[in-house]
UniProtKB/Swiss-Prot annotation:
This is Peptide deformylase. One of its GO terms (biological process) is co-translational protein modification. InterPro entries: Peptide_deformylase (IPR023635), Peptide_deformylase_sf (IPR036821). Signal peptide: none annotated. Transmembrane segments: none annotated. The active site is at residue 134. The keyword Oxidoreductase does not apply. It is an enzyme of class 3 (hydrolase).
Length: 169
């Protein structure tokens, strides 16, 4: 397994729409494993393949405190959503920035697991929010897209400054 490079805004590759996975095979499973390793190394709770410049409909999530409840969503589809909630969200592609984002309180999805088996899942709370956040990535949408243009600009400037500082280190 390897840790992959996470793209940061304003990288336009984050805006690409991911293509469906045609077959879950050893290559897809390797991508899933690398994505988990990357997500854990970056101390995230979710990662979409788009964020590591792989433009396929793959998401990995682990919102557990012990980091031992892996969830793989291949070709996820949103079936239902209900209620309204919102928390301050962060994103590995928008480091050290957070903002309040409106989300559905509950979701029901259909996806394939790491072995290609179909399943449905009903989620609420942090898991529901994380699923929605990561599914947005698959269509080229970022949490900052929910914010005012001024807030978007401020966040972009902060991330660009942070990336410049990290490049010098």
């Amino acid at each position: 397994m390897s840790v992959l490079q996470v793209l940061h805004i304003p990288d336009e590759r984050l805006r690409k729409v991911a293509k469906p996975v045609e077959e879950v095979n050893a290559e897809i499973q390797r991508i899933v494993d690398d994505m988990f390793e990357t997500m854990y190394a970056e101390e995230g709770i979710g990662l979409a393949a788009t964020q590591v410049d792989i433009h396929q409909r793959i998401i990995v999530i682990d919102v557990s405190e012990n980091r031992n409840e892996r969830l793989v969503l291949i070709n996820p589809e949103l079936l239902e959503k209900s209620g309204e909630t919102g928390i301050e969200e962060g994103c590995l592609s928008i480091p050290e920035q957070r903002a309040l984002v409106p989300r559905a309180e509950k979701v029901k999805i259909r996806a394939l697991d790491r072995d290609g088996n179909p399943f449905e899942l009903e989620a609420d709370g942090l898991l529901a929010i994380c699923i929605q956040h990561e599914m947005d990535h698959l269509v080229g949408k970022l949490f900052i897209d929910y914010l005012s243009p001024l807030k978007q600009q401020r966040i972009r400037q902060k991330v660009e400054k942070l990336d410049r500082l990290n490049a010098r280190a």
